[in-house]
């Protein structure tokens, strides 16, 4: 085995690519590492196309092994299970920039598996996996128009930072990942703390320029270790079949694409498609239906794109920069903590907010350590939203990705846990969909959060932009429909407030998208966002002053950290009894901060009084009302404040001589006692004699 190694500096890090030693039966395999974070990436490509294959079967799997961080998995089986949400998102991050680089007509099955085998807690594996996948595909010889580079851009102290460490990311106002070839940006995924459009574009350009180091290094690596390029030629278009499809369908499709209502339009297009297939297969039974459908789809694209470039109205009759009609309702569900319905044309989100306590936080067991997430965002896309039947169950990759994008859009305006001590969960139910449901989720979430009384910094709106480019002509479209997304050259989603951008996601299918085109798209998106925010502010302009009557009230109090053990009790008995008796939830931090949550305010007052009682200090000279807990020959033990027991010696029970304690006291009897002394060991000496004046004494009733 003679491994081939390529090493290069990338910003503040050293990247190493190695091939030839491991997984030699795969089409290509690369061990990619960046400062001790190592990802092993394999590519297997099938030489033959499956019969009847009519789409490109590319699969990307990303998996993290716990041994990479020197840990053993939890749970009963002690091995890794199904991919986590984070793993799914990184798999999508790898997939998105490489998918457009395979030529049209290439239908061979390809599987990319990226496995994290070593992790440095300061270096995120996602970037390493993207670089490794690019290198492995480039080595494999498959018809891949790469390589791509990938860069993470931070924004710290008004400066862009290339590939910031985990520690630096905590100080950064931006987390942007950009991927592209030497000529073009292909993908952007970002979250920002309300930056301007100009700053966001500058970050994209900066990241693309910096990643050229990676692209050049992979090219050199391929020159040394690459396999021969596949002798693959794109299938010749069947001119005769194309002409037949056009003759039958072109005019009818042109009319169908003037129908503004989605369902009616789809029914018409499906009928035309069925007619085309029936007519052509009747003439020639050997013609594949898949081939006819591909030509039909290409014709649809040609018609829609041609009209847009020619300046004609869009599918639903709008101009290029018009946003569809908006309809907003807040407070739509009576018992939830906050809710809103946001409708934009034929896209609709029912957003619901639930407030919980810190114990509702999600604990994420990641390779870099355990952390808590106090803001949860879940996106559901049921089949009825597009008028179809289908499987209902655990979220698919797309739902996870859209939920994370919507969360990124809203995260910048959320209060910290110290400002608003609630765990917040937002669920966006997509009840109708015709383009840009993730951005509808951002708008719906912003409205529902305000309805719930969450003190968000400002309203947030999201908009999806599209682009159609033919040669030197291009048109940027605001608020794209599903068809425009599918048939266009760019999907460009922007979320933000009136003052700046909170999230930007870009997927570009072609080369030649210049920074100037991106700037036009960002400016057009800003105008659309301002329009949507204006309508949203008419519905609800600020967070409600009070949270829902059905939401838990959280009250905080401080106790001496040394007293925490007293409140918890032996084996948690005291705190458990308190929560069960009052129906509250109690959380205690190490610094002595006690958070009590309950829907019933009176229950909270009871708990606070009990905790004050438990943690109260016994004062010498003070008089307390206590209960006799046990009797002894030499005196009686009395529980006073906080269930602290003191001894009333037999000589201190009465003014006269006492022969037998039980003649004067019984267990459970309430008595008034005065604290005579607290010795060094904390033992309390009590008396029932000479209690003094009530004005000078402290009387506390103690409940057992």
From Swiss-Prot:
The keyword Nuclease does not apply. It is an enzyme of class 2 (transferase). One of its GO terms (cellular component) is cytosol. InterPro entries: ExoRNase_PH_dom1 (IPR001247), ExoRNase_PH_dom2 (IPR015847), ExoRNase_PH_dom2_sf (IPR036345), KH_dom (IPR004087), KH_dom_type_1 (IPR004088), KH_dom_type_1_sf (IPR036612), NA-bd_OB-fold (IPR012340), PNPase (IPR012162). It holds the Pfam family RNase_PH. Residues 552-611 form the KH domain. GO terms for biological process: mRNA catabolic process; RNA processing. Mg(2+) binds at residues 485, 491. Its cofactor is Mg(2+). Residues 621-689 form the S1 motif domain. One of its GO terms (molecular function) is polyribonucleotide nucleotidyltransferase activity. Keywords: Cytoplasm, Magnesium, Metal-binding, Nucleotidyltransferase, RNA-binding, Transferase. Its EC number is 2.7.7.8. It is found in: Cytoplasm. Its main location: cytoplasm. It catalyses: RNA(n+1) + phosphate = RNA(n) + a ribonucleoside 5'-diphosphate. Involved in mRNA degradation. Catalyzes the phosphorolysis of single-stranded polyribonucleotides processively in the 3'- to 5'-direction. Belongs to the polyribonucleotide nucleotidyltransferase family. HAMAP family: PNPase. Component of the RNA degradosome, which is a multiprotein complex involved in RNA processing and mRNA degradation. This is Polyribonucleotide nucleotidyltransferase. It comes from Mannheimia succiniciproducens (strain KCTC 0769BP / MBEL55E). The gene is pnp.
